[in-house]
């Protein structure tokens, strides 16, 4: 198993040990057997300028660390190579915001590190920076979390409830009374009249997916008409929905992809031409898609080479990303301005 990476690397967020402005074509940053213990279930969680790797409950971190978002307990501004994080317990879910990270264990306990300037970690307001993972005092047990730029949404074990914290000035905390003027430092419960199966967070918006397949969006409407998107996504054949900074995309049972929202960098252009897709990953303003032949495609914002095509022009039509000959891509992960793929040999 190999981990490939490309795109922005000014903080070392690709984890290859050699920080540079950008990497325009995929390169190998880890193998298994090796120090990262990669397997087909390993997950890469890219944040704003940092990256987490979760594999069998163990957590590794690389990149931007000025707010302690790598969870290493150090004053190191950036971490150029993946380093194992000393976490309180094995994590089963991890989400990365712009400059913070939250992990959840098998018992539904949440832990956070990084910036808490807006309450996004759910910790007391006196804690602005947290350099090691600290337990969050949650009112309920939680099963997953989605982190935006400055807010966090937790799916609770009680399936009709979420817990929210952070900045809610755009309405992204799903408050039924509308946007909040003050930051929410202590996680609060928001209850709905039906069961929630997934939570997603964009820059300043939140998307909830319910068990009846319907979707509900909250927050900044500048680049999206929420009612139109909710209608398009609330159908039975949607098998995966992902959100970017200011757009959303959905994968359907027939292998086709739809997208809506901001498109000035090509975020949603041309995705209708993708066929036989089995997985999508949506970054802040670019996207990745994997097809049934294990080929990888990219599109959208490409200022840092994050589309992996050998240049930095924005990509308005999905293009095939080429790894070394003979490689089969089995998963893909898009971040802010960086991208990752898990691959193995086709033989």
Give the location of each predicted region.
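Eukaryote-biased RCC1-like beta-propeller repeat architecture
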Residues: 1-347
């Amino acid at each position: 198993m190999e981990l490939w990476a490309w795109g922005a690397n000014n903080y070392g967020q690709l984890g290859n040990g050699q920080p540079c402005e950008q990497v325009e074509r995929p390169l190998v940053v880890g193998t298994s057997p090796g120090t990262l213990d990669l397997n087909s279930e390993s997950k890469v969680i890219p944040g704003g300028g940092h990256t987490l790797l979760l594999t069998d409950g163990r957590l590794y971190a690389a990149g931007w660390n000025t707010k302690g978002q790598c969870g290493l307990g150090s004053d190191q501004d950036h971490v150029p190579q993946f380093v194992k994080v000393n976490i309180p317990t094995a994590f089963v879910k991890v989400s990365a915001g712009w400059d913070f990270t939250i992990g959840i264990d098998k018992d539904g306990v949440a832990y956070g590190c990084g910036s808490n300037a807006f309450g996004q970690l759910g910790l007391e307001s006196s804690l602005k920076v947290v350099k090691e993972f600290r337990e969050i005092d949650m009112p309920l047990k939680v099963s997953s979390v989605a982190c935006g730029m400055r807010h966090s949404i937790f799916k609770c074990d009680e399936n009709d409830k979420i817990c929210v914290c952070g900045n809610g000035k755009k309405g992204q905390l799903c408050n039924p009374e509308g946007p909040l003027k003050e930051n929410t430092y202590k996680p609060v419960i928001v209850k709905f009249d039906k069961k929630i199966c997934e939570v997603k967070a964009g820059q300043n918006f939140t998307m909830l997916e319910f068990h009846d397949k319907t979707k509900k969006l909250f927050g900044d409407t500048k680049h999206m008409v929420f009612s139109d998107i909710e209608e398009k996504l609330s159908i039975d054949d949607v098998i995966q929905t992902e959100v970017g900074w200011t757009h959303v995309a959905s994968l359907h049972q027939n292998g086709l992809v739809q997208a809506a929202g901001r498109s000035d960098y090509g975020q949603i252009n041309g995705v209708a031409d993708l066929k036989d897709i089995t997985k999508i990953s949506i970054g802040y303003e670019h996207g990745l898609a994997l097809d049934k032949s294990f080929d990888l495609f990219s599109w959208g914002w490409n200022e840092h080479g994050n589309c992996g095509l050998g240049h930095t022009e924005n990509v308005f039509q999905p293009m095939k990303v080429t790894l070394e000959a003979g490689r089969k891509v089995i998963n893909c992960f898009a971040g802010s301005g960086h991208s990752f793929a898990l691959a193995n040999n086709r033989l």
